[in-house]
C-alpha cells in the first residue's frame, strides 16, 4: 500500500478514511470553526485542515460524494480537482449548490472523496497529420442516444 504523508494543520481535522474495504475514494471531511451555508446557485471554499505530501508521479483527485449530489445537488465545479505532488498547502474543497435550498456544512461533515492515482507527464511531438481511426473527428454525441 502506498504511504502518503499527511499533516493536521488543525488538531480538530479528520483524516481521510475509506468507508469500505474496496472503496476507491477516501471520504474527506470539513474542518470548520463555524458552519458554512452554501446558498443556491453559489459556491464556497471549504477547509479540511489537512495538507498532504504525495510521492512524485501521483496526484490526488477530489470528487463529489454521490449522496450529496443525489439528495442535495451539491457537487465540485472543478471535478475532479487535482492536487499535484508538489503542492504543500491546505487541501480545500469548492462546493457548489445546484439545488433550490441552502446547504449547511458543519465541522466533520464528509464533503468529498479523495482518490490517489498515478500520473505520467508527457512530451508532445508536433506533426502535420494524425493517424486515421473509425471514429475520426466524431465528437460530442456522435454515437447518439439509442439503446445499447
Curated annotation (Swiss-Prot):
Q: In which pathway is this protein known to take part?
A: Pyrimidine metabolism; dUMP biosynthesis; dUMP from dCTP (dUTP route): step 2/2
EC numbers for this chain: 3.6.1.23
GO biological process entries: dUMP biosynthetic process; dUTP catabolic process
- Keyword GTP-binding assigned: no
Provide the alphabetized UniProt keywords.
Hydrolase, Magnesium, Metal-binding, Nucleotide metabolism
Provide the cofactor list for this protein: Mg(2+)
Q: Which InterPro entries match?
A: dUTPase (IPR008181), dUTPase-like (IPR029054), dUTPase-like_sf (IPR036157), dUTPase_trimeric (IPR033704)
GO molecular function annotation: dUTP diphosphatase activity; magnesium ion binding
Positions annotated to bind substrate: 65-67, 78, 82-84, 92
Indicate whether Iron-sulfur appears among the record's keywords. Answer: no
Sorted alphabetically, which Pfam families does this protein's record hold?
Answer: dUTPase
Q: What is the reaction catalyzed?
A: dUTP + H2O = dUMP + diphosphate + H(+)
Q: Where is the signal peptide?
A: none
Q: Which NCBIfam families does the UniProt record give? A: dut, PRK00601.1
Q: What does this protein do?
A: This enzyme is involved in nucleotide metabolism: it produces dUMP, the immediate precursor of thymidine nucleotides and it decreases the intracellular concentration of dUTP so that uracil cannot be incorporated into DNA.
Family note: Belongs to the dUTPase family.
HAMAP family reported in the protein's UniProt record: dUTPase_bact
| Name this protein carries in UniProt | Deoxyuridine 5'-triphosphate nucleotidohydrolase
Which organism does this record belong to?
A: Chlorobium luteolum (strain DSM 273 / BCRC 81028 / 2530) (Pelodictyon luteolum)
Taxonomic lineage of the native organism:
Bacteria, Pseudomonadati, Chlorobiota, Chlorobiia, Chlorobiales
Identify the gene encoding this protein.
dut
Amino acid at each position: 500500500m502506498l504511504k502518503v504523508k499527511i499533516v493536521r494543520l488543525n488538531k480538530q481535522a479528520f483524516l481521510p478514511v475509506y468507508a469500505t474495504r474496496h472503496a476507491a475514494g477516501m471520504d474527506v471531511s470539513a474542518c470548520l470553526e463555524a458552519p458554512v451555508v452554501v446558498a443556491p446557485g453559489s459556491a464556497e471554499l471549504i477547509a479540511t485542515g489537512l495538507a498532504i505530501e504525495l510521492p512524485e508521479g501521483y496526484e490526488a483527485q477530489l470528487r463529489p460524494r454521490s449522496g450529496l449530489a443525489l439528495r442535495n445537488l451539491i457537487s465540485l465545479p472543478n471535478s475532479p480537482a487535482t492536487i499535484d505532488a508538489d503542492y504543500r498547502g491546505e487541501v480545500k474543497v469548492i462546493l457548489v449548490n445546484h439545488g433550490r435550498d441552502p446547504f449547511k456544512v458543519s465541522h466533520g461533515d464528509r464533503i468529498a472523496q479523495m482518490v490517489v492515482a498515478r500520473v505520467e507527464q508527457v512530451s508532445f511531438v508536433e506533426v502535420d497529420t494524425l493517424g486515421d481511426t473509425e471514429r475520426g473527428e466524431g465528437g460530442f454525441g456522435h454515437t447518439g442516444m439509442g439503446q445499447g
